[in-house]
């Protein structure tokens, strides 16, 4: 489990420093949902298994787990394959118990284009507009206190 977390961190850091984030909407969608040959990618069985292990580990340790989808631009959301959205929603709901595992899906939050750095990342303006909503939600769930 620790090796998996280290690998994920290494991959995320590498992507940030090599510029493998951002780009045009076409580039972003292709990177997230299609392989090099243009074939559609679903979450892998490995990803699904690791999610299950994370949920189990959090429950064992009596930790709250928040499965979270950040706000994205309308254009981005329109391009996400519906089968991907349905599968990720289904996987998340499979684990939600509203006591320790929560699913916060903010992809439908409507923010103006001025709030986005690119199609799937908020900029500073967006962060300042969105953070109070997230804080209120976490407070209502009892995950954080005011």
PLM features per residue range, with description:
Residues 1-61:
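Secreted/periplasmic serine-hydrolase-like ester/acetyl group-modifying domain
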Residues 29-34, 68-71, 92:
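Generic detector of short, locally flexible boundary/turn motifs and exposed helical patches
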Residues 24-28, 62, 66, 100-108:
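Membrane-targeting and insertion segments and their boundary/processing signals
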Residues 77-146:
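Long, positively charged, glycine-interspersed low-complexity recognition regions
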Residues 55-80:
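Active-site segments of SGNH/GDSL-like serine hydrolases
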């Amino acid at each position: 489990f620790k090796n998996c977390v280290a690998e994920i961190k290494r991959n995320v850091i590498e992507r940030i420093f090599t510029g493998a984030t951002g780009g045009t909407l076409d580039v972003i969608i292709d990177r997230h949902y299609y392989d090099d040959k243009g074939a559609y990618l679903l979450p892998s069985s490995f990803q699904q298994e690791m999610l299950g292990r994370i949920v189990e580990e959090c429950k064992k340790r009596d930790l709250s787990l928040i499965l979270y989808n950040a706000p994205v631009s309308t254009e981005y959301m329109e391009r996400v394959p519906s089968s991907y959205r349905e599968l990720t929603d289904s996987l998340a709901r499979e684990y939600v118990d509203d006591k320790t595992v929560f699913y916060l899906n903010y992809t439908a939050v409507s923010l103006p284009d001025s709030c986005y750095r690119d199609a799937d990342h908020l900029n500073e303006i967006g962060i300042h507009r969105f953070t109070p909503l997230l804080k209120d939600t976490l407070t209502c769930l009892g995950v954080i206190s005011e």
